[in-house]
C-alpha cells in the first residue's frame, strides 16, 4: 500500500502543481484583460475629452463669429444712421439763415475750379439767393442740384458740381472708421 500512497501523493502533488500553474495563468490572463480594458477605457476617455474640447473650441469660435457679425451689423447700422442724419440735416440746411454764406463759398470754389464759367446752376428754390451772390455769370435753374451749385464751363460740355451732399459722399469712406470707433465707445 505504501506504493499506492506514494503514487497517490505524487499524483496529488502533480494535480496541485497543475492547478497552481493554471491559477497563475488564469490570473495573468485576467490581469492582461484588465490592463487591456483599462487601456481601452483610458483611450476612449482621452478621445471623448478631446472631442469635448474640440466642441468647446468650435462653439466659442461660432459664438465669436456671431458676436463679431452682430457688432459689424450694429456698426454698419449705426454708421448708416449717422449718414442719414447728416443727409437729413444737409437737406434742411438750405432753409437756414446761414445758407447764403455756405452757398456763396460753394459758388466761389466752383468759379475757382472753372474760371471761364458760362453759367451757374442752382436749385430753383435757391435762385433768389444765388442771383444776389453772383455777378457777371448767368444763373440758371437746375432741379437736380440740391444744396449747392454746378458751374458750367463755356460751351456747356464740362463743369463742376459743388454740393454739400457731394462733399459728404467724397468723405464717407474716410469717415466710416472714425464714426464706427466713436459709436463703439
UniProtKB/Swiss-Prot annotation:
Superkingdom, natural source: Bacteria
This protein's encoding gene: atpE
Keywords: ATP synthesis, Hydrogen ion transport, Ion transport, Transport
Tagged with keyword Ion transport: yes
The keyword Zinc-finger appears for this protein: no
InterPro entries for this protein: ATPase_E_C (IPR038495), ATPase_V1_Esu (IPR002842)
Role, per record: Produces ATP from ADP in the presence of a proton gradient across the membrane.
Biological process terms in GO annotation: proton motive force-driven plasma membrane ATP synthesis
GO molecular function, one term: ATP binding
Name the UniProt record assigns to this protein: V-type ATP synthase subunit E
Family under the similarity heading: Belongs to the V-ATPase E subunit family.
Gene Ontology cellular component list: proton-transporting two-sector ATPase complex, catalytic domain
Amino acid at each position: 500500500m505504501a506504493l499506492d500512497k506514494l503514487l497517490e501523493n505524487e499524483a496529488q502533488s502533480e494535480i496541485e502543481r497543475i492547478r497552481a500553474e493554471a491559477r497563475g495563468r488564469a490570473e495573468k490572463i485576467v490581469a492582461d484583460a484588465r490592463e487591456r480594458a483599462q487601456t481601452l477605457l483610458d483611450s476612449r476617455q482621452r478621445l471623448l475629452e478631446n472631442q469635448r474640447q474640440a466642441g468647446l473650441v468650435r462653439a466659442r469660435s461660432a459664438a465669436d463669429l456671431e458676436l463679431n457679425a452682430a457688432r459689424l451689423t450694429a456698426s454698419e447700422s449705426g454708421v448708416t444712421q449717422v449718414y442719414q442724419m447728416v443727409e437729413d440735416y444737409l437737406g434742411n440746411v438750405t432753409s437756414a439763415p446761414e445758407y447764403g454764406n455756405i452757398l456763396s463759398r460753394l459758388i466761389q470754389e466752383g468759379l475757382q475750379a472753372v474760371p471761364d464759367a458760362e453759367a451757374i446752376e442752382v436749385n430753383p428754390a435757391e435762385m433768389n439767393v444765388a442771383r444776389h451772390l453772383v455777378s457777371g455769370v448767368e444763373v440758371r435753374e437746375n432741379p437736380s442740384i440740391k444744396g449747392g451749385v454746378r458751374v458750367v464751363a463755356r460751351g456747356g460740355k464740362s463743369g463742376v458740381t459743388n454740393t454739400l451732399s457731394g462733399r459728404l459722399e467724397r468723405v464717407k469712406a474716410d469717415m466710416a472708421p472714425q464714426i464706427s470707433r466713436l459709436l463703439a465707445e
